[in-house]
Amino acid sequence: MPNMKTLGEFIVEKQNDFPHASGDLSSLLGSIKLAAKIVNREINKAGLVDITGAIGSENVQGEEQQKLDLYANDKFKAAMEARDQVCGVASEEEDEAVTFNKDLNRNAKYVILMDPLDGSSNIDVNVSVGTIFSIYRRVSPIGTTPTQDDFLQPGNQQVAAGYVIYGSSTMLVYTTGNGIHGFTYDPSLGVFCLSHENMQIPEDGQIYSINEGNYIRFPQGVKKYIKFCQEDVPADNRPYTSRYIGSLVSDFHRNLLKGGIYMYPSTAMYPNGKLRLLYECNPMAFLMEQAGGVASDGKNRILDITPTELHQRVPFFVGSTNMVKQVESFIEEYPEQH
């Protein structure tokens, strides 16, 4: 059996590459790992206990909240507050950012933004779901209560980002700006083990992921690109394969490994797109760029967008470089919206 490297060992090893590292970020990633194991346990038994389904309320996006959404939100929030590295959390499930006012938290360097359970409506039908997280250094003075400005930073200021995918196996994938690495959970040992080091997405792919049920509502450029994907041109390996799970983490993870593009454009119903810039697009864009891919709103680099509100939405195109550039060219050529 080859030498097995755990997530904890890997984090410490990478920390040693930076002579001035304090260990705070490593400890924070350890908190995320712990919360992920707790949430993974509940997801695995969700069909046996009364924790699936909707609770009858909506989040700030107007989306029906699932019981596991709130469970995951509470567990990740508690894990962050219990350590002294985080001064506040912004979550897709919370109307406002949550600041931690204990002395030990006010002296923390970092804020975290998260989608605690992406794709949670799929749990009832046993489809993979995930957690997405994004970490920034605070810009407000250490020792004070964090401000809105700490959370409204462009994605190019992220110091770390990642996701956990709860599927046939559970994986944690993360970057600190020096490559992207994946760890698979071994339930018999209770540890995440390095399984995918320095992940890279192919420059070209043959998979496109989009909810084609909304085709009639898409901008003209996106419609033209879908037709391009469907054309029978064997010399260009077309038609491409359409694969759409409906869970961003799951679709992203597959395309990262195999090559492809994930698209959630603006529609007549969602003119600014549906995905959240801070909780979904920025962390996934950071990961994708570290893997050699591209993330765009159809015109601009996602990581260069300066957010103006916590729950801001944007169109999102992410994946293999040549595929994202191709859809951008169609959007530029056919600027009509719908």
Curated annotation (Swiss-Prot):
Similarity comment: Belongs to the FBPase class 1 family.
Note on how the cofactor is bound: Binds 2 magnesium ions per subunit.
Organism: Photobacterium profundum (strain SS9)
Domain of life: Bacteria
Cellular localization per UniProt: Cytoplasm
E.C. designation(s): 3.1.3.11
Binding site for substrate: D118, G119, S120, S121, N211, Y244, K274
Residues that coordinate or bind Mg(2+) 1: E92, D115, L117
Gene3D superfamilies, A to Z: 3.40.190.80, Fructose-1,6-Bisphosphatase, subunit A, domain 1
Catalytic reaction equation(s): beta-D-fructose 1,6-bisphosphate + H2O = beta-D-fructose 6-phosphate + phosphate
Molecular-function annotations in GO: fructose 1,6-bisphosphate 1-phosphatase activity; magnesium ion binding
Binding site for Mg(2+) 2: D115, D118, E280
Any one Gene Ontology cellular component term annotated for this protein: cytosol
Needed cofactors: Mg(2+)
GO BP term, example: fructose metabolic process
Name of this chain's protein: Fructose-1,6-bisphosphatase class 1
Metabolic or biological pathway, per its Swiss-Prot or TrEMBL entry: Carbohydrate biosynthesis; gluconeogenesis
Subunit and interaction comment: Homotetramer.
Keywords for this protein: Carbohydrate metabolism, Cytoplasm, Hydrolase, Magnesium, Metal-binding
